[in-house]
């Protein structure tokens, strides 16, 4: 019964959500696009000619926005464990980023030290228990960070979803040791009750 009430409440919030309505009106696949757009408007992360990887891409809001900003030049690779409808000038990998063969498929597409920007909106399936969800989420951040350290070119940038909890401070410290600028962003489109924030790391140092 509680789950039914919770589901109804979530659906009501979803359909009343200004960002959901905005995404529908502007032809975007998800409200999440406005999280990336707000940060990109301030930081100018995405430009034509770049090589960009988008992890946790489905249904494709971030990828769609990046594709528009890149204007058909450069290379944009999206990856997700869930299917995603095709987008112009986007290469899509269907698979679990945690699996070695999927990671290798991605590495094969992007020559080492040529990546300009890593985007990651990856999140685990949430159980509702912070003791379970936060470590799972942090593991995904760690995997994304490891990939960035192997693939980013000098001066490259990274934007990853990160949840407040155990391991948060350590990951921020690690990022500050490898990048010139590290900040935490909470975009307006992130729901206030959510523990999600975004770690922006700019200027990768080899």
Curated annotation (Swiss-Prot):
Q: What is its EC number?
A: 2.1.1.166
Q: Which GO terms describe its molecular function?
A: rRNA (uridine-2'-O-)-methyltransferase activity
Where is the catalytic site? 161 (proton acceptor)
Q: Could you say which residues bind S-adenosyl-L-methionine here?
A: 60, 62, 80, 96, 121
GO cellular component entries: cytoplasm
Spell out the Gene3D superfamilies in the cross-references: Vaccinia Virus protein VP39
What Pfam families does the database record attribute to this sequence?
FtsJ
Q: Which UniProt keywords apply?
A: Cytoplasm, Methyltransferase, rRNA processing, S-adenosyl-L-methionine, Transferase
Q: Would I find rRNA processing among this entry's keywords?
A: yes
Coiled-coil residues? none
Localization per record: Cytoplasm
Report the principal subcellular site. cytoplasm
Instruction: Report disulfide bridges, numbered on this chain.
Output: none
Q: Which reaction does it catalyse?
A: uridine(2552) in 23S rRNA + S-adenosyl-L-methionine = 2'-O-methyluridine(2552) in 23S rRNA + S-adenosyl-L-homocysteine + H(+)
Q: According to its UniProt record, which protein family does this protein belong to?
A: Belongs to the class I-like SAM-binding methyltransferase superfamily. RNA methyltransferase RlmE family.
Q: What is this protein called?
A: Ribosomal RNA large subunit methyltransferase E
Highest classification ranks of the organism: Bacteria, Pseudomonadati, Pseudomonadota, Gammaproteobacteria, Legionellales
